[in-house]
Structure formats: C-alpha cells, structure tokens
C-alpha cells in the first residue's frame, strides 16, 4: 500500500465515521517491497502493533517484520521505510520522515515547541477527543 497514513471515513448509514486501516485488516509489511515475507506464516505471531506519528496524524498499525536469514533489525527495517523508530531495541513508536521534517521547519521558523506541535497532530487526528490519543511528544525530542 502506498498511502498507509491517510485517515479514512466510512458511511455507516447515518453519518461518516472514522475508521482505520487496521480496522480493515491492513498490515504494513516491511521488506519485500510491501509483500509478506516468505518466511512469515501470515499470522499475528510475526507482527507487532506500533504507533506511527505522521504529518497527517497519529496512527496505530500492525507491522509484519521481514524474517529472512540475515534480515535487518527491526529499527533498520523501519528506517528503510522512512520511519524513525523511538528506540533501537523494541520500537513501539515511529515517526515518519515527513513529520520530522515538518517539525524541524515549524520549530525553526515558528518557534513551535514539541508539545504544541504534537498537540496539533493530536487535534488533526481527533479534534473532538484529542486526549484519548497517546502522548509521544517527549519521544519526538
């Protein structure tokens, strides 16, 4: 999938409701150009759930790692897909390169703090209930 960080809405008969790609069963496959790793069984055993912060908002995705011999560490697989992991050992949060570039420009030109920038992303994701989203701005620093 080429656009994993788009916000979706689905008509439920009365109104459009927000729905995630994860709700639709989407899993972000790392390695093999987005295809499932041949050594993966396709079950949840080889996947993790991570929070991805993008300039379009905050998303939770299932991620299936490449398991081939000589496969890269998880943090390197994320970097190859232009996602900067929050930690090297067990990444549970990642920031897209786009959001990092946007934060850099906002902080240099507008003097935006990490807290304010992250609050903006929370509002973009859910303007009605931004406090229901995870707080990751300290990781952004």
Segments predicted by a language model, with ranges:
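Hydrophobic core positions in small helical hairpin nucleic-acid-binding modules
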Residues: 1-141
């Amino acid at each position: 999938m080429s656009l994993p960080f788009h916000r979706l809405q689905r008509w439920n008969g009365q109104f459009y409701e927000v729905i995630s790609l994860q709700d639709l069963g989407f899993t972000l496959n790392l390695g093999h150009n987005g295809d499932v790793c041949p050594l993966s069984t396709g079950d949840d055993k080889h996947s993790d759930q991570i929070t991805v912060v993008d300039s379009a908002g905050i998303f939770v995705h299932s991620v299936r790692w490449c398991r081939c011999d000589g496969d890269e560490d998880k943090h390197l697989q994320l970097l190859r897909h232009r996602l900067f992991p929050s930690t090297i050992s067990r990444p549970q949060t990642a920031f897209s390169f786009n959001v990092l570039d946007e934060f850099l420009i906002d902080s240099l030109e507008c003097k935006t703090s990490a807290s304010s920038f992250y609050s903006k992303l929370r509002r973009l994701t859910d303007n009605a209930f931004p406090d229901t989203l995870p707080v990751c701005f300290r990781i952004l620093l």
